[in-house]
């Protein structure tokens, strides 16, 4: 029998949980699904997502790390496909969070409050949302 794996979540550590939650809900429609708070207050973990997939983004806030995280050379990202690319672009432009646009490829990237890159991709021919 072949061993199988299913991706279930990605973790981003954040410096301001409330600012991040507001950003992800406004920019990508991701809402809080569940939360775990340490008894001693040392951390809070919030899982966010939407109805289009079971995959979740885990936002982790650590009490002893109030500053933004060093993301190195930022050579990683999480991608989101949208069924209304033009409206998404207009929203992100109004939020001032577009970091890079690749017109030739028909994609762009936004950054969250901690500097994580998020790729925005339109639905392409032959692909489903």
Residue ranges and their predicted role:
Residues 1-21, 75-78, 124-129:
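N-terminal beta-strand motif that seeds the catalytic metal site of vicinal oxygen chelate
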Residues 2-3, 33-36, 47, 89-129:
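Vicinal oxygen chelate
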Residues 4, 11-54, 109:
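Core segments of cupin and vicinal oxygen chelate
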Residues 23, 85-91:
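Short amphipathic alpha-helices within nucleic acid-binding modules
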Residues 51-55, 64-66, 84-86:
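Short, charged/polar surface micro-motifs in flexible loops or helix N-caps
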Residues 52-57, 115-118:
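Short, charged/polar, Gly/Pro-enriched secondary-structure boundary elements
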Residues 61-65, 122-125:
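Acetyl-CoA-dependent GNAT
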Residues 71-74, 78-86:
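Mid-chain, well-packed structural core segment of small domains
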């Amino acid at each position: 029998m072949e061993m199988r794996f299913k991706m279930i979540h990605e973790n981003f550590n954040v410096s301001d949980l409330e600012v991040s939650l507001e950003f992800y809900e406004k920019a990508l429609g991701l809402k809080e699904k569940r939360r775990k708070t340490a008894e001693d207050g040392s951390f809070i973990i919030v899982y966010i997502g939407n109805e289009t997939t079971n995959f979740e983004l885990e936002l982790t806030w650590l009490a002893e790390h109030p500053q933004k995280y060093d993301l190195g050379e930022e050579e990683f990202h999480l991608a989101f496909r949208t069924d209304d690319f033009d409206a998404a672009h207009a929203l992100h432009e109004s939020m001032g969070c577009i970091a890079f646009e690749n017109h030739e490829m028909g994609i762009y990237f936004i950054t969250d409050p901690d500097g994580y890159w998020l790729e925005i991709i339109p639905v392409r021919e032959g692909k489903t949302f």
